Amino acid sequence: MTQAEKGEAENGKEKGGEKEKEQRGVKRPIVPALVPESLQEQIQSNFIVVIHPGSTTLRIGRATDTLPASVPHVIARRHKQQGQPLYKDSWLLREGLNKPESNEQRQNGLKMVDQAIWSKKMSNGTRRIPVSPEQARSYNKQMRPAILDHCSGNKWTNTSHHPEFLVGEEALYVNPLDCYNIHWPIRRGQLNIHPGPGGSLTAVLADIEVIWSHAIQKYLEIPLKDLKYYRCILLIPDIYNKQHVKELVNMILMKMGFSGIVVHQESVCATFGSGLSSTCIVDVGDQKTSVCCVEDGVSHRNTRLCLAYGGSDVSRCFYWLMQRAGFPYRECQLTNKMDCLLLQHLKETFCHLDQDISGLQDHEFQIRHPDSPALLYQFRLGDEKLQAPMALFYPATFGIVGQKMTTLQHRSQGDPEDPHDEQYLLATQSKQEQSAKATADRKSASKPIGFEGDLRGQSSDLPERLHSQEVDLGPSQGDCLMAGNDSEEALTALMSRKTAISLFEGKALGLDKAILHSIDCCSSDETKKKMYSSILVVGGGLMFHKAQEFLQHRILNKMPPSFRRIIENVDVITRPKDMDPRLIAWKGGAVLACLDTTQELWIYQREWQRFGVRMLRERAAFVW
């Protein structure tokens, strides 16, 4: 080494030492500055997979794809032993339908629907003439099917090679006589945890992993061994279960083997997909409806609520109304997968929200069940086509009794792996406040003998007050922090708030009332004004003719008069940029993949392995 080279090396060491000294006093982040080399590379969108899991449909595709693949989110698993009892998750049926009060509630809901239909005039200024189901029943009872073909053209899935599992369309078309259990791993937007077979968290995650892996291989043509070169964007509900999200992230990174992940909320992604910056998002899915207000890429926590009904409830309600009108296909069963598919199709074909369509109309439909003849039925329907979708605004018509129908954003239960969750922060914050108050009390207390008794009384009372506070911090829904002598009042306030929440969540809010409630929870009048001016409807549950005008009319009529005077126009958007509303959230996930700011949101496999759920707190674009 030459003298010059030695000098350069020494200078380098000195500079390095100085740099180290400068950094000694700096607070270091949880995640080290040294990150995987992949961070330095420019992310290519065709190596990013966007996953939007729904209750009935999985939407999955590369960020560069124009449209995602839409796959039924269902799996059929072969029985381990001969003679095992068959198990299948229900689709259109649900708990709370067969209670003694169900039919009475259904009838009361239908009366409210009929009253609303009659009270709103048609566009020519006249009132609709109601059509009773008896007018259609006598005609429909006489109808017999015509045989179009002795073979429907559809076949049951071939299971002669005894596959361990079948996914998507193949699972839907498994013959009920074959030895397969049917599982829908997501119900009403959450993981389908239940006490039956395949209902544990581990089993549900295993089903999801198989379905997603199959879709990636079949529709995206990506071998699973190559997932280490890919990253994933996962869309989650606005009101999410932290434990479930953590398990899904762990599955994607550690089991499926993706190199990185970004987790974001459906509502925010819907704004990205529609190109709107501030809007009230109304996501009407197949099994749940969620409403929240999004402003500049942030979902306002207080405005979030989830309603436990959706498109499949409308399908079931439509079937009940058609039965009253003498539905000619008398063999229809809600427990049959093929009949559920048929009812969904009939709802999408015939139902509408157009007040101007009145009177009896003739319709026809075909039944093409596997290994059966193709049949053609003719029948008549009147107001049933309008009554069924209106049940979204009068959910008593669904006849669901004794179920929690509305969910608000609650405080998390806490996670032992996350040392800085809300429970920890609240507990430490409260102890600091108590400690500070106790110190202040001691300082302010004077030394004369006459005051010693009072001081002793105060200090002896302090542990009780501390104890009462710590006990109260346990529940997840509490919003009150107790301090000092206010503990009893705070406890009373907390209990009354909990009671109010439980009463509110027991009610089935109509869609229009849910939107008004969400907007009313915004913090300022300016924000409320923005939200009333822009209501975006996404999801496939409200894709009815004239739905946009109908919802707009309901919101205008029910919004507070103070806002009606200052808002020029209530804009309800059902098809932004002429896009399919079912794909908008997925499209927003694809847009998110291409944003420069997303570079800071990636959680990498090695980081997750080392830091676990803390990475979600560090990197999530929303408050974890």
Swiss-Prot record:
Phosphoserine modification, residue list: S132, S412
Segments of skewed composition (Basic and acidic residues): 1-25
MF GO annotations: ATP binding
Chain positions recorded as ATP binding sites: S55, T56, D283, V284, G285, D286
Signal sequence range: none
GO biological process: cell division; DNA recombination; double-strand break repair; regulation of DNA-templated transcription
GO CC annotation, single: Ino80 complex
Ranges where the record places region Disordered: 1-29, 430-462
Protein keywords: Acetylation, ATP-binding, Cell cycle, Cell division, Chromosome, DNA damage, DNA recombination, DNA repair, Mitosis, Nucleotide-binding, Nucleus, Phosphoprotein, Transcription, Transcription regulation
The protein's role, per its UniProt record: Plays an important role in the functional organization of mitotic chromosomes. Exhibits low basal ATPase activity, and unable to polymerize.
Family per similarity comment: Belongs to the actin family. ARP8 subfamily.
Name by which UniProt lists this protein: Actin-related protein 8
Species annotation: Bos taurus (Bovine)
Upper taxonomic lineage: Eukaryota, Metazoa, Chordata, Craniata, Vertebrata
